[in-house]
Amino acid sequence: MNILLDTNILVFISRSKNFNSLVNFINPENSLIYISIVTQGEIQSLAVRKKWNEKRIELIENFIERIGIIDVNQRLIRAYSDIDSYSQRENPSFETYPFSTPRNMGKNDLWIASVAAMMGLELVTTDNDFDHLNDVFFDIRKIQPVDFLPFF
């Protein structure tokens, strides 16, 4: 299955001292890798706000040039609507929900989740924010932050 990287994964990639090994760890099956246009915006904003050095910026920009970037389109907007209404327990396509209270997601996370759903991609993340969507809209592969330590 092809994969979609959450923004937090790109942050770990940008910090890596062993880039190729880390990418192999994240993508052991050598699947196609994608990010959302939102992730690209988030990572560029982080680089500016956190004053990343040129080497770190160049590393992540070179990586982004080698992967697919999914832009906003009408299908993505529909997926966003489905996921947001599901997360708020207000999606008419569902009679029951496996969670008792609404799951408030950040808007950028909603866009990222929508890309995974629309494209049928496995989302690779360190966050718990997507857990309620797992096996409903897409699959999630969660990596614990401690698992990145050997690559720094």
Functional labels for PLM-detected ranges:
Residues 113-152:
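Acidic, PIN/NYN-like endoribonuclease modules and their adjacent C-terminal/linker elements
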Residues 1-36, 45-62, 152:
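Short, well-structured N-terminal submotif of metal-dependent ribonuclease cores
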Residues 10, 19, 40-43, 77, ...:
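A generic structural signal for short hydrophobic patches within well-formed alpha-helices
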Residues 34, 70, 141-143:
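General small-molecule cofactor/ligand-binding pocket signal
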Residues 69-122:
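Active-site neighborhoods of divalent-metal-dependent phosphate/nucleic-acid chemistry enzymes
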Residues 60, 64-72:
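Helix-adjacent hinge/juxtasegments
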Residues 1, 30-33, 66-68, 117-122:
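Short active-site oxyanion
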Residues 6-7, 43, 80, 116:
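Generic structural signal for small/hydrophobic residues in well-ordered secondary structure
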